[in-house]
Structures are given as structure tokens and as C-alpha cells.
Amino acid sequence: MRHYEIVFLVHPDQSEQVPGMIERYTGILTQAGGQIHRLEDWGRRQLAYPIIELHKAHYVLMNVETTAEAVEELETAFRFNDAVLRSMVMRTKAAITEASPMAKAKDERDTRRSSEERAPRAEATEEAEESAENTAE
């Protein structure tokens, strides 16, 4: 079996259907005896150039190990699904399992935001406790 990196873009109005699409497409690959090494849903992002007068699309990245026949079936499924704007399948030399730079950046942003949210909350609770102590005196 060969290793592939697959990226597909979904119409932004169909973002609610993306989990079902991912399930369907991973099912095609795993039924052929393939294995999913990495699956990342990047969400709705800005396009580099308009596609069918759209400026945003929902991005999904998969790194898989499967047969060439399964990849052909997947590409056919992409072609017949009108919600899939673009797709790209690249053969890779080895399985890629670590998080992509996009996912790493998102994780860093999320941790930064959560730590920033916790800090004001902690300050607010300290101020509330101090004001409660002052009113009690």
C-alpha cells in the first residue's frame, strides 16, 4: 500500500455536512484495507483566489495509507460531489502522523486564548473577594 496526502475544499454553505463527508470518504479508504494516519478539519478559511465567485471554503486534510484503487474511487466520489470545490491527492514517501503547521498554529492560538481568558477571570474573582471583604468590614 502507498501513502497519500489528500486535501479537499468544501463549499462554505455545506460546512454542516463536512463531518458526514469525512466519515464517508474515510469509509471508502478503510473498506479497501487502508489506514488513516492523520485527519485534520481546518475549518472555513480564506481562498487565495476566488473559485466560482467564492472567497472562502472549508478545508480538510487527510494522510492515509491505502491502495491506488481506493484513491481512484475517492477521486471519483470527489468529482461527483458538487459540494467539493477542489481536491488534491499527492503520493508521499512515508506516513505523516505529526500535526501539520496549520494545526500547530491553531493549537497555539487556542492555548493562548484560553490562558488569556483565565487570567482576567482570576483577577475578577480576586477583586470580587476583596470587595466582599471590604463591605463585610
UniProtKB/Swiss-Prot annotation:
Compositionally biased region (Basic and acidic residues): 104-124
Gene3D superfamilies assigned to the protein according to its UniProt record, in alphabetical order: 3.30.70.60
Molecular function as annotated in GO: small ribosomal subunit rRNA binding; structural constituent of ribosome
Gene Ontology, cellular component aspect: cytosolic small ribosomal subunit
Chain positions covered by the region annotation Disordered: 96-137
Ranges of Acidic residues composition bias in the record: 125-137
Pfam family, one: Ribosomal_S6
Top-rank taxon, per record: Bacteria
Example of a GO biological process term: translation
Keyword terms of this UniProt record: Ribonucleoprotein, Ribosomal protein, RNA-binding, rRNA-binding
Physiological role: Binds together with bS18 to 16S ribosomal RNA.
Family as reported in the entry's similarity comment: Belongs to the bacterial ribosomal protein bS6 family.
PANTHER family the UniProt entry points to: MITOCHONDRIAL 28S RIBOSOMAL PROTEIN S6 (PTHR21011), SMALL RIBOSOMAL SUBUNIT PROTEIN BS6M (PTHR21011:SF1)
Protein name per Swiss-Prot or TrEMBL: Small ribosomal subunit protein bS6
